[in-house]
Amino acid sequence: MNSFFIKIMLFLVISHVSCSKSETDCCNKTEINTDNNIQQKAKVKIMPLGASRVQGARPNYESYRYELWKLLEESQYPFDFIGTQKDFANYPIADFDKDHEGRGGWTSSQINNNIDTWISQTGVPDIVLFSAPGGNDILTHQPYRQVLENIHSIIDKIQKHNPKVIIVLEKMAPGHSSFNTPNRKALFDVIHSDVEKIAQEQTTETSKVVVVDMANGFEDAFLADVLHYNSIGAKFVAQRYYHILTSFLEKE
């Protein structure tokens, strides 16, 4: 009788230990799964780089940045606009990311002379949206050979900071037809062709330089003045950037 009782007690003790271990393992697995579920993708750092078409000047004319931000947010891409400049204009959505690297009137020489400093201050970008390269140079009659050298140098410096950077290089949208003299149009046609060459020459095994065509399909009705976007133009440009970016971004 005593032997039978002892066996029963041993069975109950072993069963209790086994159940406790199973519950502990189950809890541990739940905690691991919970940790995995809350992990988020790192935000891709995007630098909008250029002059007044990047900067914007609400309410006089628009930048594409707000419309692009909305498209990326709505699609739930993890991203962060970066830059040393802040946009202090009012926008319908208060938490719009206003960081950028656009300075009205700046030439490729000025950007080339400052890009290293900006990156050291704002952090290294994963993607750079290089708006209207050479646009202000043409308008201010800078030597064209120097313009091309500056664009190459800007890209070289960005790639030195991040050998895996993606650079989106614009074929810039034209100015108003009343503003485009035959000479200006010829120069813009040349730089459009050279932008394609620059992208090919600057692409490396790890860093892609891709072209986005803002010129084809762009109309006078998209401009607030002879050079800058109105809201329609900003949406047009943002949509083209968005289409390119979806090839490189992953959703959360």
Regions found by a protein language model. Give the residues of each.
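Bacterial Sec-dependent N-terminal signal peptides
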Residues: 16-43, 251-252
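Loop/turn elements at helix/coil->beta-strand transitions in domains of secreted/extracellular proteins
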Residues: 42-45, 75-80, 123-129, 161-168, ...
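Conserved SGNH/GDSL esterase-like catalytic core that processes O-acyl groups on lipids
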Residues: 53-149, 189
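Substrate-gating cap/lid alpha-helix
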Residues: 174-213, 231-235
